Amino acid sequence: MTTAALLESPWHPLLSQPATEAAIALLGCWLVRRFADGRVIRGRIVETEAYEAGDPACHGYRRQTARNRSMFGPPGQVYVYQIYGRYHCINLATEAADLASAVLIRALEFPDTEAIAGAGPGRLCRFLAIDRQLDGSWLGPTSPLDLEAADYPLGTLIQTTRIGLTRGVDLPWRWYLAESPAVSRRDRRAEAEQMGVSV
């Protein structure tokens, strides 16, 4: 995708926000996966995490490398990395080019599919056959990956801390839709505080 086409994308304004804002705006949107054989799978984004420059948990915290280059955008570029030598995670670059800023898609809810299929970044990438080959690709109507707008009310939004980190552990930069069965890990205390219910 050319820079001009990227700037004309309907997703450019949403993803040009700081990651902490884009992570909220992406909830309820649909991540679209197109396959070469014509198949299309859509998953509703129900959980996200934000990573920004200056955040010690951000992959680009120290510097840009060949491995994390896609995280530096421009907004709308796809950043895929591998963890534990077997699982992949998909992120969408945000805010501005040459800035380490991205949103991790942490859970997707797939229609007519068991919730476990999208409950976690590794699971959803396996279900959608997302791996490092898609790193550096772009969201778009002719690309393997795209976004579609949210088409029904989000429900209750929960804000809490991120998962599986050793740095930046206190930053409340994870958001999820409380009513979704596909959320990877619930924070019952945060739900009690933000929904006004007992634990």
Swiss-Prot record:
Q: Is Transcription there in the keyword field?
A: no
Enzyme Commission no: 3.2.2.-
* Record keyword DNA damage present: yes
Q: Name one GO molecular function term.
A: DNA binding
Q: Which superkingdom, per the lineage?
A: Bacteria
Q: Which family does it belong to?
A: Belongs to the DNA glycosylase MPG family.
UniProtKB keywords? DNA damage, DNA repair, Hydrolase
Q: Name one Pfam family in it.
A: Pur_DNA_glyco
Q: Which NCBIfam families match?
A: 3mg
Q: Which organism is it from?
A: Synechococcus sp. (strain ATCC 27144 / PCC 6301 / SAUG 1402/1) (Anacystis nidulans)
Per its record, how is this protein called by name?
Putative 3-methyladenine DNA glycosylase
Q: Say which enzyme class the record assigns.
A: hydrolase
- Record GO biological process: base-excision repair
User: What PANTHER family does this protein map onto?
Assistant: DNA-3-METHYLADENINE GLYCOSYLASE
Q: What is the lineage of its organism?
A: Bacteria, Bacillati, Cyanobacteriota, Cyanophyceae, Synechococcales
